[in-house]
Amino acid sequence: MATTNSSSQLTGNLALMPVSNHDRVFGWSQHAALWFSLGVGLLVMQIGAYLVPAVGTRDAAIAIVLGSLIGAGLLAWTAKLGCDSGLTSAGLMHATYGSAFAKLPVLLNIVQLIGWTTFELVVMRDGTAAIGKQSFGLDLSGFGGMVATTAIWGGVLCALIAASMLTTVRKLIGRFALPLVIASLLWLTWQFGGQIAAKGFDAFWTRPGNGSMGLFSAMDLVIAMPVSWLPLIADYARHGKNGKSAMSGTWLGYALANIWCYALGVMVVSVATPGTDLVTALLLAQGGLIALGLILFDEIDNAYGDAYSGAVSSHSLLPNWSIRQWGLLIVVACTVLALFLPMHSLEPFLLMLSSVFVPLYGVILGRWSLNATSVNTTQKSVDVTAAALWIAGIVLYHVMAKWAPQWGAALPTLAFTFVLAWLTRPQSARALQAV
């Protein structure tokens, strides 16, 4: 169990204190259900559809399976650290980088989470408009329609944020949303799988790419999705009953969902008419309206996950506001931003911003993952070594992406920061790991 400094206790900063045993209620099934649900999304399918023209079906499948297993494994490893230490993501950043310097990655995380929450609201709004036009002849693309649909989804998200996170995960996601989204994925797989079989599996499997991307670059793109969840997974995993179930449940749940949704994107682009967007292709499938509606409904938990974690991180900086109050403010702000920001144009920026969290968590895992009981938030204001390793990792990531894309950027950066962070870990951590 992690230790915390007295100032956090006195100010009631729940984001920097280890979670109480009373709130450790998630078992294996809750971890698996949550991260399967969060692994499902239209953006994942869109990236899967993007891979095929670049690398071909066979290499896309390899990149999807390996990238998902590695990315989900990294998520699961971080989940175990969060569960064993009882700390939030912000708490882990404070313990690793120092109380003053940690504010920088915490702020970057808040910016990322606000961006992703806004993006999810746009996805749900646009999906609702597509369903309305395709199925009912309603034109919701005007400003009035945009305001109405965005406000409806924002209102649903506010209601979820106002409720208990523990209840939302255990009852709404685990018992209600998960079975419905699995049913929709099974139906879409059956529909598009049947079309592929009718056209011939060999032609589908041997489709070549145009060479615009290599296998490792494709894996980086796949890994980018689970990596985008790294800065918030501890906010949920710390409520687990034990680290092993948090790790295995997260790994299996997220990897399965990620592979499935990427594969669906590959299947859709392989049978759809050229130029048809993903949402339209899904709607044109038999039963696609219901299936897409269920997937859109599932998008709300992605937005919830981002907004709740953004609230936890914000509370860590300004604890005078509760996590619930921060959550409501973030949702309202994101609902307004969804009306004005060109979120589809900002999507590459959000993925790029996610790249800074590969070295960030390489350092965190290198410092603490081998003995989470040594984690504490009584660090100095700046851990110069950890900060330097993170910055060096960011530089390495972008150098690799630009000048050696054939080797990928995520895995070399993760290995570099992890090894150096482990070698330079504090003496207290060395002593505990030696016991």
Spans of model-derived segments:
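Transmembrane alpha-helical segments of multi-pass small-molecule transport proteins
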Residues: 134-164, 179-187, 214-230, 255-256, ...
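Hydrophobic alpha-helical segments and their helix-loop junctions in multi-pass secondary transporters
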Residues: 121, 125-129, 161, 179-205, ...
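Membrane-water interface regions at transmembrane-helix termini and the short interhelical loops
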Residues: 54, 80, 104, 130, ...
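C-terminal membrane-solvent junction of multi-pass transporters and transport-like membrane proteins
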Residues: 18, 361-423, 427-435
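Juxtamembrane transmembrane-helix boundary signature
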Residues: 64-96, 107-112, 118-121, 425-431
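Membrane-interface loop-to-helix entry segments
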Residues: 149-192, 247-254, 350-362, 410-418
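Hydrophobic, membrane-embedded alpha-helices of multi-pass small-molecule transporters
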Residues: 28-44, 189-196, 205-268, 283-304, ...
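Membrane-interface "cap" regions at the ends of multi-pass membrane proteins
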Residues: 1-58, 208-218, 238-245, 425-435
